[in-house]
Amino acid sequence: MSTHTEEQHGEHQYLSQVQHILNYGSFKNDRTGTGTLSIFGTQSRFSLENEFPLLTTKRVFWRGVVEELLWFIRGSTDSKELSAAGVHIWDANGSRSFLDKLGFYDRDEGDLGPVYGFQWRHFGAEYKGVGRDYKGEGVDQLKQLIDTIKTNPTDRRMLMCAWNVSDIPKMVLPPCHVLSQFYVCDGKLSCQLYQRSADMGLGVPFNIASYSLLTCMIAHVTNLVPGEFIHTIGDAHIYVDHIDALKMQLTRTPRPFPTLRFARNVSCIDDFKADDIILENYNPHPIIKMHMAV
Protein backbone atom coordinates (compact mmCIF):
# COMPACT_ATOMS: atom_id res chain seq x y z
CA MET A 1 0.00 0.00 0.00
CA SER A 2 1.32 3.43 -0.90
CA THR A 3 2.39 5.65 2.00
CA HIS A 4 1.40 8.78 0.06
CA THR A 5 -1.78 10.75 0.42
CA GLU A 6 -3.44 11.86 -2.81
CA GLU A 7 -1.68 15.26 -2.68
CA GLN A 8 1.73 13.70 -1.99
CA HIS A 9 1.56 10.93 -4.58
CA GLY A 10 4.85 10.81 -6.48
CA GLU A 11 3.10 10.45 -9.83
CA HIS A 12 1.88 14.05 -9.59
CA GLN A 13 5.46 15.14 -10.36
CA TYR A 14 5.24 13.46 -13.76
CA LEU A 15 1.75 14.76 -14.45
CA SER A 16 2.77 18.29 -13.47
CA GLN A 17 5.75 18.15 -15.83
CA VAL A 18 3.48 17.03 -18.67
CA GLN A 19 1.02 19.85 -17.94
CA HIS A 20 3.86 22.38 -17.77
CA ILE A 21 5.19 21.31 -21.18
CA LEU A 22 1.70 21.49 -22.68
CA ASN A 23 1.29 24.99 -21.26
CA TYR A 24 4.74 26.47 -21.81
CA GLY A 25 6.72 24.17 -24.12
CA SER A 26 8.29 25.64 -27.24
CA PHE A 27 7.54 24.00 -30.57
CA LYS A 28 10.63 22.39 -32.06
CA ASN A 29 11.21 20.32 -35.15
CA ASP A 30 13.08 17.12 -34.35
CA ARG A 31 15.11 14.29 -35.82
CA THR A 32 12.02 12.14 -36.45
CA GLY A 33 10.13 14.85 -38.34
CA THR A 34 7.18 14.58 -35.93
CA GLY A 35 7.57 17.85 -34.03
CA THR A 36 7.63 18.38 -30.27
CA LEU A 37 6.72 20.74 -27.47
CA SER A 38 9.90 21.04 -25.43
CA ILE A 39 11.33 22.53 -22.24
CA PHE A 40 14.86 22.27 -20.86
CA GLY A 41 15.61 20.99 -17.36
CA THR A 42 13.29 19.03 -15.06
CA GLN A 43 13.74 16.92 -11.95
CA SER A 44 11.57 14.52 -9.98
CA ARG A 45 12.19 12.31 -6.94
CA PHE A 46 10.58 8.96 -6.15
CA SER A 47 10.82 6.99 -2.93
CA LEU A 48 11.75 3.33 -3.36
CA GLU A 49 11.39 2.41 0.30
CA ASN A 50 7.81 1.17 0.55
CA GLU A 51 6.57 1.42 -3.02
CA PHE A 52 7.70 1.17 -6.61
CA PRO A 53 7.15 4.12 -9.02
CA LEU A 54 5.41 2.39 -11.91
CA LEU A 55 2.93 4.98 -13.18
CA THR A 56 -0.73 4.24 -12.59
CA THR A 57 -2.53 6.81 -14.74
CA LYS A 58 -1.96 4.40 -17.62
CA ARG A 59 -0.79 0.80 -17.74
CA VAL A 60 2.97 0.65 -18.30
CA PHE A 61 4.46 -2.35 -20.15
CA TRP A 62 6.12 -3.87 -17.08
CA ARG A 63 7.35 -7.05 -18.74
CA GLY A 64 9.05 -4.86 -21.33
CA VAL A 65 10.80 -2.88 -18.57
CA VAL A 66 12.09 -6.08 -16.98
CA GLU A 67 13.22 -7.79 -20.18
CA GLU A 68 14.95 -4.68 -21.54
CA LEU A 69 16.85 -4.12 -18.29
CA LEU A 70 18.00 -7.75 -18.16
CA TRP A 71 19.07 -7.35 -21.80
CA PHE A 72 21.13 -4.28 -20.87
CA ILE A 73 22.70 -6.18 -17.98
CA ARG A 74 23.69 -9.03 -20.31
CA GLY A 75 25.51 -6.48 -22.45
CA SER A 76 23.44 -7.44 -25.47
CA THR A 77 23.02 -5.18 -28.49
CA ASP A 78 20.80 -7.54 -30.51
CA SER A 79 17.18 -6.40 -30.78
CA LYS A 80 16.20 -9.90 -31.92
CA GLU A 81 16.87 -11.18 -28.38
CA LEU A 82 14.19 -8.85 -27.07
CA SER A 83 11.84 -9.71 -29.93
CA ALA A 84 12.17 -13.40 -29.07
CA ALA A 85 11.01 -12.52 -25.54
CA GLY A 86 7.95 -10.77 -26.96
CA VAL A 87 9.33 -7.26 -26.45
CA HIS A 88 9.42 -5.24 -29.65
CA ILE A 89 10.43 -1.77 -28.45
CA TRP A 90 13.75 -1.87 -30.35
CA ASP A 91 12.46 -3.58 -33.51
CA ALA A 92 12.09 -0.40 -35.56
CA ASN A 93 15.62 0.80 -34.75
CA GLY A 94 17.07 -2.59 -35.68
CA SER A 95 15.08 -3.05 -38.88
CA ARG A 96 16.80 -3.49 -42.23
CA SER A 97 15.28 -0.28 -43.57
CA PHE A 98 16.41 1.78 -40.55
CA LEU A 99 19.95 0.33 -40.62
CA ASP A 100 20.23 1.05 -44.34
CA LYS A 101 18.92 4.58 -43.81
CA LEU A 102 21.84 5.16 -41.41
CA GLY A 103 24.34 3.62 -43.81
CA PHE A 104 24.84 0.35 -41.89
CA TYR A 105 24.41 -1.76 -45.02
CA ASP A 106 26.75 -4.56 -43.89
CA ARG A 107 25.25 -4.86 -40.42
CA ASP A 108 22.94 -7.77 -39.61
CA GLU A 109 19.31 -6.92 -38.97
CA GLY A 110 18.82 -6.40 -35.24
CA ASP A 111 22.41 -5.22 -34.64
CA LEU A 112 21.98 -1.89 -32.86
CA GLY A 113 25.67 -1.14 -32.50
CA PRO A 114 27.47 -0.41 -29.20
CA VAL A 115 24.38 0.85 -27.35
CA TYR A 116 23.58 0.81 -23.62
CA GLY A 117 24.42 -2.76 -22.66
CA PHE A 118 27.75 -2.70 -24.48
CA GLN A 119 28.77 0.54 -22.76
CA TRP A 120 27.68 -0.75 -19.35
CA ARG A 121 29.71 -3.96 -19.65
CA HIS A 122 32.48 -3.28 -22.22
CA PHE A 123 33.14 0.47 -22.28
CA GLY A 124 36.12 1.21 -24.53
CA ALA A 125 36.20 -2.16 -26.28
CA GLU A 126 36.17 -2.23 -30.08
CA TYR A 127 32.69 -3.07 -31.30
CA LYS A 128 32.68 -5.76 -33.99
CA GLY A 129 29.03 -6.71 -34.17
CA VAL A 130 26.54 -8.96 -32.39
CA GLY A 131 27.28 -12.59 -31.69
CA ARG A 132 30.88 -11.91 -30.72
CA ASP A 133 32.23 -12.78 -27.28
CA TYR A 134 33.49 -9.59 -25.64
CA LYS A 135 34.33 -11.22 -22.30
CA GLY A 136 37.20 -9.41 -20.60
CA GLU A 137 37.20 -6.57 -23.14
CA GLY A 138 36.71 -2.96 -22.15
CA VAL A 139 35.61 -1.70 -18.75
CA ASP A 140 32.77 -3.50 -16.99
CA GLN A 141 31.21 -0.40 -15.47
CA LEU A 142 28.34 -2.28 -13.85
CA LYS A 143 30.66 -4.72 -12.07
CA GLN A 144 32.96 -1.90 -10.96
CA LEU A 145 29.97 0.05 -9.67
CA ILE A 146 28.68 -2.87 -7.61
CA ASP A 147 32.16 -3.67 -6.28
CA THR A 148 32.61 -0.04 -5.19
CA ILE A 149 29.22 0.06 -3.47
CA LYS A 150 30.26 -3.03 -1.50
CA THR A 151 33.79 -1.95 -0.62
CA ASN A 152 33.73 1.86 -0.54
CA PRO A 153 30.13 3.04 -0.21
CA THR A 154 31.09 6.65 0.60
CA ASP A 155 32.82 7.03 -2.79
CA ARG A 156 31.54 9.97 -4.84
CA ARG A 157 32.57 8.37 -8.13
CA MET A 158 29.95 5.62 -8.34
CA LEU A 159 28.90 6.38 -11.89
CA MET A 160 27.82 4.47 -14.97
CA CYS A 161 27.99 6.24 -18.34
CA ALA A 162 26.54 5.22 -21.70
CA TRP A 163 27.78 8.31 -23.58
CA ASN A 164 30.92 7.14 -25.38
CA VAL A 165 31.69 9.84 -27.93
CA SER A 166 33.91 7.65 -30.11
CA ASP A 167 31.20 4.96 -30.37
CA ILE A 168 28.21 7.21 -31.09
CA PRO A 169 28.62 7.06 -34.90
CA LYS A 170 28.28 3.26 -34.67
CA MET A 171 25.01 3.36 -32.71
CA VAL A 172 21.56 3.29 -34.30
CA LEU A 173 20.52 5.83 -31.66
CA PRO A 174 22.76 7.76 -29.27
CA PRO A 175 21.92 7.08 -25.61
CA CYS A 176 19.06 9.11 -24.17
CA HIS A 177 19.64 8.04 -20.56
CA VAL A 178 23.33 8.80 -20.46
CA LEU A 179 24.61 8.91 -16.88
CA SER A 180 23.59 7.36 -13.58
CA GLN A 181 25.17 8.08 -10.20
CA PHE A 182 24.64 6.01 -7.07
CA TYR A 183 24.73 7.14 -3.45
CA VAL A 184 24.74 5.21 -0.18
CA CYS A 185 23.56 6.71 3.11
CA ASP A 186 22.24 5.02 6.26
CA GLY A 187 22.14 1.63 4.55
CA LYS A 188 20.04 2.94 1.66
CA LEU A 189 21.02 3.00 -2.01
CA SER A 190 19.79 5.86 -4.18
CA CYS A 191 20.27 6.62 -7.86
CA GLN A 192 20.20 9.82 -9.88
CA LEU A 193 19.80 9.54 -13.64
CA TYR A 194 20.69 12.28 -16.11
CA GLN A 195 18.70 11.89 -19.29
CA ARG A 196 19.68 14.19 -22.17
CA SER A 197 16.46 13.64 -24.11
CA ALA A 198 13.12 12.38 -22.81
CA ASP A 199 9.93 11.44 -24.63
CA MET A 200 7.46 12.27 -21.86
CA GLY A 201 4.60 10.22 -23.27
CA LEU A 202 6.22 6.88 -24.04
CA GLY A 203 9.78 6.95 -22.74
CA VAL A 204 9.74 8.57 -19.32
CA PRO A 205 7.31 6.16 -17.60
CA PHE A 206 9.56 3.34 -18.86
CA ASN A 207 12.78 5.10 -17.80
CA ILE A 208 11.53 5.80 -14.27
CA ALA A 209 10.61 2.15 -13.82
CA SER A 210 13.80 0.82 -15.41
CA TYR A 211 16.29 2.76 -13.29
CA SER A 212 14.19 2.27 -10.16
CA LEU A 213 14.32 -1.47 -10.82
CA LEU A 214 18.07 -1.35 -11.46
CA THR A 215 18.52 0.47 -8.14
CA CYS A 216 16.48 -2.16 -6.32
CA MET A 217 18.45 -4.98 -7.95
CA ILE A 218 21.82 -3.44 -7.08
CA ALA A 219 20.62 -2.77 -3.53
CA HIS A 220 19.64 -6.44 -3.25
CA VAL A 221 23.04 -7.79 -4.32
CA THR A 222 24.90 -5.31 -2.09
CA ASN A 223 22.80 -5.98 1.03
CA LEU A 224 21.36 -2.47 1.10
CA VAL A 225 17.77 -1.28 0.92
CA PRO A 226 16.44 0.92 -1.89
CA GLY A 227 16.31 4.61 -1.03
CA GLU A 228 15.31 7.05 -3.73
CA PHE A 229 15.34 7.49 -7.50
CA ILE A 230 16.01 11.01 -8.78
CA HIS A 231 15.30 11.71 -12.45
CA THR A 232 16.96 14.73 -14.05
CA ILE A 233 16.07 15.52 -17.66
CA GLY A 234 17.62 17.88 -20.22
CA ASP A 235 15.30 18.19 -23.24
CA ALA A 236 11.91 17.08 -21.90
CA HIS A 237 9.49 16.91 -24.79
CA ILE A 238 6.04 15.83 -25.89
CA TYR A 239 5.60 14.66 -29.47
CA VAL A 240 2.73 16.54 -31.06
CA ASP A 241 0.93 13.30 -31.91
CA HIS A 242 0.93 12.41 -28.18
CA ILE A 243 -0.79 15.60 -27.03
CA ASP A 244 -4.36 14.29 -27.05
CA ALA A 245 -3.35 11.03 -25.35
CA LEU A 246 -1.53 12.90 -22.59
CA LYS A 247 -4.44 15.28 -22.09
CA MET A 248 -6.58 12.20 -21.49
CA GLN A 249 -4.00 10.86 -19.04
CA LEU A 250 -4.05 14.14 -17.12
CA THR A 251 -7.75 13.64 -16.36
CA ARG A 252 -6.99 10.48 -14.40
CA THR A 253 -6.30 10.30 -10.67
CA PRO A 254 -3.16 8.40 -9.61
CA ARG A 255 -3.71 5.16 -7.73
CA PRO A 256 -1.40 3.71 -5.07
CA PHE A 257 1.96 2.68 -6.47
CA PRO A 258 2.67 -1.08 -6.55
CA THR A 259 5.37 -2.82 -4.54
CA LEU A 260 8.36 -4.85 -5.70
CA ARG A 261 9.99 -7.93 -4.23
CA PHE A 262 12.41 -10.61 -5.35
CA ALA A 263 11.41 -14.27 -5.37
CA ARG A 264 14.79 -15.52 -4.14
CA ASN A 265 18.08 -14.30 -2.79
CA VAL A 266 20.38 -13.33 -5.66
CA SER A 267 24.00 -12.48 -4.95
CA CYS A 268 25.23 -11.60 -8.47
CA ILE A 269 23.52 -9.08 -10.75
CA ASP A 270 24.04 -11.41 -13.74
CA ASP A 271 22.00 -14.16 -12.10
CA PHE A 272 18.67 -12.31 -12.07
CA LYS A 273 15.93 -13.87 -14.19
CA ALA A 274 12.63 -12.30 -15.15
CA ASP A 275 10.77 -14.69 -12.82
CA ASP A 276 12.80 -13.39 -9.85
CA ILE A 277 11.26 -9.93 -10.16
CA ILE A 278 7.76 -9.76 -8.72
CA LEU A 279 5.51 -6.71 -8.96
CA GLU A 280 2.56 -6.72 -6.58
CA ASN A 281 -0.62 -4.66 -6.22
CA TYR A 282 -0.38 -2.91 -9.57
CA ASN A 283 -3.84 -1.59 -10.39
CA PRO A 284 -3.42 1.07 -13.09
CA HIS A 285 -5.86 2.86 -15.31
CA PRO A 286 -6.20 1.35 -18.82
CA ILE A 287 -3.46 1.53 -21.40
CA ILE A 288 -3.20 4.66 -23.56
CA LYS A 289 -1.73 3.96 -26.98
CA MET A 290 0.91 6.33 -28.36
CA HIS A 291 2.98 6.01 -31.52
CA MET A 292 6.77 5.73 -31.16
CA ALA A 293 8.61 8.32 -33.25
CA VAL A 294 11.50 6.74 -35.17
Swiss-Prot record:
Does this UniProt record's set of keywords contain Transferase? yes
GO MF terms listed in the record are: thymidylate synthase activity
Catalytic activity field = dUMP + (6R)-5,10-methylene-5,6,7,8-tetrahydrofolate = 7,8-dihydrofolate + dTMP
The residues listed in the UniProt record as binding (6R)-5,10-methylene-5,6,7,8-tetrahydrofolate, with positions renumbered to this chain, are D199, A293
Protein keywords: Methyltransferase, Nucleotide biosynthesis, Transferase
Q: Name one GO biological process term.
A: dTTP biosynthetic process
Task: Give the pathway listed in the UniProt entry for this protein.
Answer: Pyrimidine metabolism; dTTP biosynthesis
Positions of the catalytic residues:
C176 (nucleophile)
Methyltransferase listed as a keyword:
yes
Q: Which InterPro entries match?
A: Thymidate_synth/dCMP_Mease, Thymidate_synth/dCMP_Mease_dom, Thymidate_synth/dCMP_Mease_sf, Thymidylate_synthase, Thymidylate_synthase_AS
Record-listed E.C. numbers: 2.1.1.45
- Chain positions recorded as dUMP binding sites: R31, R156, R157, R196, S197, A198, D199, N207, H237, I238, Y239
According to the record's subunit comment, the protein's assembly and interactions are:
Homodimer.
Which protein family is named in the record? Belongs to the thymidylate synthase family.
Q: Fetch the HAMAP family from UniProt.
A: Thymidy_synth_bact
NCBIfam families on file: PRK01827.1-3 (NF002497), thym_sym (TIGR03284)
Name the UniProt record assigns to this protein: Thymidylate synthase
